[in-house]
Each structure stands twice: as structure tokens, then as C-alpha cells.
Amino acid sequence: MLRRMLRLLWKVCKWTLLVAVALMALVVVINWRDEPLSDEARALLAEQPPANHVPDRENILVAMAGIKAPEGADVFEAGRRYMEQTARQGESAEQEQKLTWKETEPPFDCTISMGDDFLQCAELERGRLAETLAFNKTLVARYRAMQRLPHYAAIQDPGTWVVDMDFGTPFTIRKFLLAQAMLDIKDGNTDAGLEFFKKDMALWRKNLDGKFCLLDSMFATAWLMQDARGVSMLLSLPTKGEQQQEWRALLAPLSPGQQSLHAAWEGEIKFNHNYAPELKRWKSYHEVSSRGDYNICDIFSGTMEKCPAWQAWLEENIQSIFLQPNASFNDNIPFYKTWLKLTDLSWKDYLAQRDVMLAPFKKPAKLQMDWIYNPVGKKSSTHLMAPAEYIGRLHDADTYLRLIRLQLELRLAEMLSGQVADFLKQLDAPYCAPCSDFSWDAQTRQLSFHPCSEQLAGWVPPSATLPEPAAPAH
């Protein structure tokens, strides 16, 4: 009897094991097979950057990658090696014996998004700014040389390596030079200050002109807008009449190629490397997006066809956006709670607590928070930056440059508040984007974006270059 029961138990165990193995094999086979890709998806996956005929020694991107090469080393060779190494190893790639940016403690933690407080902060740190720039003279000289290069072009497919490259040092150098340039202009050394703005804004315009360039349109627009904000802050300072043309040229409209930001946002799946595996399983980027798993960059890019109205949709869906899978780089409840706490802080407290509060989260968290945090104190019910302000700085670059140029025209012409309405009527009204209406504060003598009230869906930026605004009457 016992032997019969043992034999029966053995059969049951044996067949159970065989069924389990068969089921596991079936699961492996099913998951091994991807859905057939559409022609659009196949074309996107097979997409290769155009042949790059730009010599390395004329390429801003290569210089940026090699800027931390050891003293006396060839920056371009180091940049090429670092880019190739990053393509193979991703985040684990590092330059050997690299130069590092050094500054005294506590670090200079002022950012241009602070608005007028940035100039005040730079004034308080004047001595340390000059000392730090002198101490890092090799890196500073390399950045200034990089500004003079004629081209910006990627050398490889950016989707596989661009997100892993360390470009922190060039941007740190730039922040110090930006602060120093503003102090130079404030001190009356206008030529030196303007020289920085001319070269730096030209640098980011080249980035916008590039194809398959890494920092792509969002980063290039952000840095260009920061320079433009620096110019805007300087408008309250006395400006010599003979320099008016230089200021106007600095804020010239973007070229048609530079204006094509919507196209770059719409098709740039490579920007968020988290979507790369998804593309192989879904037929197209739009099908991935249609599930509602929006990345924060998609939210602010204006590509949400579902959005009936920017503000209303965002306020209604913000919590679900941040708590959905793939909704952000930090798609979890602790990050969302930390995000709410940070956005409630004053700018001073935000700077003091940001790094500590974001320490447990992934690497992009600090950059992501700096984009979200409202530097001008106008918080919506979702604690987000005023939508029109955000679009102006990081998306609708040409309209934001146009706004600052208008401020400049008004400042240089010393216009009275009663003349502003007539001056604005001379502008090309149909050019205005839905969220880029202007309002005028006679007390502060400042133009600003009007609150967003129209739909973004289907809006395409114009390609025509703005005409020169008519000279206002005094």
C-alpha cells in the first residue's frame, strides 16, 4: 500500500514538474517574440545620423566632450575617445586623469532662473567669482575657445550615448562667466560683458541648427533663454545709445531652422532613453504616448493631443501623471511628495534644501526640479511654473526672444506707458503663439506673458522671420 502511494506521488510530482517546465518554456517563447513593427517604427529604428563631414577640430560637441582633458592634452582627441567610450560603456565611461572644476566652499549656488536676485547674488559673491575663474583658468580658456568653433554636429547616433555624457563642467563654467559678464556690464565695462553674450548666444544657436545634436533643442533652448534672461535683467541698467544696434542684433529672431522646435520635440524619441526599449515593443512613439505614460518632458513639449486646455488639463491630471509608470525619471510617491514640499519653499530655502531632499532620488532629479521650480513666484494650484512663462523659456524660444527684444526696444526708446499700446499694434499680431500674448505693467515698466487661455493642440510655429519693429515715437 505504501509502495503504491509513493509510486502515485512520484507520478504526480513528475508530471507537475514537466507541466511547470513546459509553461516556463511557453512564457519564454511568448515573451521572446515582439510585435511586428510598423514601417514607421522600422524607419525610426534604422535611422542613422547623416554623414558628418565636420572635422573634429571644428566641432563644438567634440570640444565639449573633451573639455576636461588633462593639462596639455589634445582636447579634441580626448573628446573623440570619451564619446566612443561612452557609446560602448554608457554611464560607466570616465575620462582618465581629467581636470576638475574647483571652487571654494560653499559653492556658488546662484542660478539665472532666480530673476533679478541672480545679479544681486553675483554682486555678493563678486570676489569669489573672480578667484574661482582665475583658479580654473585652463577650463575657462577652453570654454572661451569652444565658443569660437564654427560647427555643432553629432558624430554618432545620439540615442545610445548622449544621455550618459557628462556635460556638467561646461555649464558650470558658463554660469560663472555669465555672472561675471553681467557684473562687467553693471560696472560699465560693457564691451567685455557684451562679448560674452554675443559668443555664448551664437554657440547655442549653432546647437539649434545642428542635426542629431546631443543637447538637442530643449537644452539648447534652455541655455539660449538663460542668456536672454541675463540680457533682460540688464535692461534696467543705463545703456549707451550707440550700443542699441548691438543689443538688438543679440536678440535677433531665430532662423527658420532654429524655429523648428515642435518638430524636434515631436520626433525626438531618443531624448528619453527610458522609451528606447518601449519602441521595440510598440509600433510608434505616438502609440507609446497614447497609453498616457507621459514623461515630464513630453508634458511641457506641447505634444499632448489630448490636452483640451493647458492649465485645466494639467491641474486635473498632475497627480496621475507623476504616479503612473514611466511618468517621470522618478515615478514614485516619495518623489512626488518631495516635489510638492520643494515647490512650496522660497527661493533661498529651495537652494538650501534642494540637494539634501533630492539626494535619495535618481541623477536627473535636481535638473528636473530646477526646470519645474517657479523662479518668479507665480505658482499655479499645481505648484508648477506659470505655463506661458515655461513655454517661453524652454519651448517657444523665438517668442521669448521677441518678448525680451520688445522690452529692450521700450527701454532704449524711454517710452511712456501711454505709448506702449500703439507700439504693440505695430507688431505682426498673427505671429503670436496661443500662450504668448503680452501684458504691460506700467508701474514696473515690464512686459510679460499673458496667462495661457487657448488650446495648444495643433499649433505649429511660424517659419517666417519677424520683420523689424517700427521705431517708436518719443
Predicted regions mapped to residue ranges:
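Short acidic linear motifs
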Residues: 2-474
